[in-house]
Amino acid sequence: MHHTIKHLLETTLGFSVVLEKPKDKNHGHYATPAAFSLAKELKKNPALIAQELSKKLSEIEVFESVQSVGGYINFRLKQGFLDAQASLALSQGREFGKGDKQGSILLEYVSANPTGPLHIGHARGAVLGDALSRIGRHLGYALETEYYVNDAGNQIHLLGLSIYLAGRDSLLSLPVTYPEQYYRGEYIVDIAKEALKKWGEKAFADEAFIPELSLFGKELMLEEIRSNLADTHIHFDHYVSEKSLYPRWEETYALLQSHQGCYEGGGKVWLRSSAHGDEKDRVIVRESGEPTYLAGDIIYHADKFARPYDRYINIWGADHHGYIARVKAAIEFLGHDSSKLEVLLSQMVTLLKGGQPYKMSKRAGNFILMRDVLEDIGADALRFIFLSKKPDTHLEFDVDDLNKEDSSNPIFYINYAHARIHTMLGKSSLDSQEIEAASLEGLEDSIFDLLFLSLQLPQVLEDSFENRAIQKVAEYLRALAGEFHKFYNEHKILETPQEAALLKVCKVVALSLSQGLALLGITAKERM
């Protein structure tokens, strides 16, 4: 609907316009500041220009009224037009809000090391990435998702060593000497138990078996990670192994050299990242000749950019903020346009339970596990709360609040609105065809305001995706549910002369609620 109105304005005026929603809904459904952009060019008062434009725009058939206020031009849509838009939305069903955006996007997120279970920080980025992918695809983008598996380097050896030590110490009571760094937690002992079942005591007899334990532990962790993600309604198109890319290091290194992107110094190889906005140059090959963690990321981004997507989006933890400049510098030195890479940062999460800090997992030591919170509040509540705030802001919530059955629990509040509508539809003697064919003529303005709000979903989806502000969808759904509950409490709907018309409005509300929730990866409930 937004695009329809914008097209009508531009066709009538002959130039591009910005279409906004007035801050005060009493001013109308839409507004444009077009007069302000023309004022400088025409050297005239914006208010006078707005008055002149208003006369021209009054000729557009779908406008009930066109008013100029302080240079802004406000429009109110005709009820018949809104009725037609309601019928169109209902005929589209699950296609409602679907776009025809062009362009390909590779979205990489989570990419947690396969050395331990997913914690609640991983979960926030996971949910954000999945919601972005769902909305992006619905808008028409050719979007693919990817998980980068960090299965090379010292952390994988450390995983195998930790399993080896746990097996000797906790299972076989053999003497061990723990190093300063190793992975702790019950999950390590659990993997050691599985290794004991598979290989017997020989798995812990000699350190030569550590590489086998590393591979075994990595595969078990990846299996658990995939399971946690699936239980949160998250699936990836691709899993890319860091280890599988390492044979390409020499050619990647040669490419960096060919673009004067690296140099040797102090027995190390340095990325000349300060030339592209980083605060200093970074080591990519140690004195030992071993590539650094950054080198692995450079190979991965070389692989990414060799696949010709129009845009690349990474979702990283906020602690990786300083990493952006060095990766973008590497992309430039590989001969690619680093502006095609966009990095979104996901901030920390603080969990409470009954007002007290949420207990850390015994299984994983100093972490709150994604699995524990899933079992506490369920995937739908977890997803909604993580999507309710900007990802780059700190999030704190009490899980007990998400188990409440009242308006303080946003996911309950939204689902209750959706379920109320389905309950009414089930009780009504009218069939779907009768309801959808009903005329809305004669309904009061406040009901058309509710209908107008329910028809905003397509634009909310587009704005939220393009601005990477998925919280706007959550805010919209909560606002729509609130307006519906108000309408429900103020109107008798069933067994009235206007039953069909009122239920038609309700069906559009339900469509937007269910569609919006689905694109957040949440199931809308029809019964509660």
Swiss-Prot record:
GO terms for biological process: arginyl-tRNA aminoacylation. GO terms for molecular function: arginine-tRNA ligase activity; ATP binding. InterPro entries: aa-tRNA-synth_I_CS (IPR001412), Arg-tRNA-ligase (IPR001278), Arg-tRNA-synth_N (IPR005148), Arg-tRNA-synth_N_sf (IPR036695), ArgRS_core (IPR035684), DALR_anticod-bd (IPR008909), Rossmann-like_a/b/a_fold (IPR014729), tRNAsynth_Ia_anticodon-bd (IPR009080). GO terms for cellular component: cytoplasm. Its EC number is 6.1.1.19. The keyword Coiled coil does not apply. SUPFAM superfamilies: Anticodon-binding domain of a subclass of class I aminoacyl-tRNA synthetases, Arginyl-tRNA synthetase (ArgRS), N-terminal 'additional' domain, Nucleotidylyl transferase. It catalyses: tRNA(Arg) + L-arginine + ATP = L-arginyl-tRNA(Arg) + AMP + diphosphate. A motif ('HIGH' region) lies at residues 112-122. Pfam families: Arg_tRNA_synt_N, DALR_1, tRNA-synt_1d. Keywords: Aminoacyl-tRNA synthetase, ATP-binding, Cytoplasm, Ligase, Nucleotide-binding, Protein biosynthesis. It is an enzyme of class 6 (ligase). Its main location: cytoplasm. It is found in: Cytoplasm. The keyword Transcription does not apply. HAMAP family: Arg_tRNA_synth (MF_00123). PANTHER family: ARGININE--TRNA LIGASE, CYTOPLASMIC, ARGINYL-TRNA SYNTHETASE. Monomer. Belongs to the class-I aminoacyl-tRNA synthetase family. This is Arginine--tRNA ligase. It comes from Wolinella succinogenes (strain ATCC 29543 / DSM 1740 / CCUG 13145 / JCM 31913 / LMG 7466 / NCTC 11488 / FDC 602W) (Vibrio succinogenes).
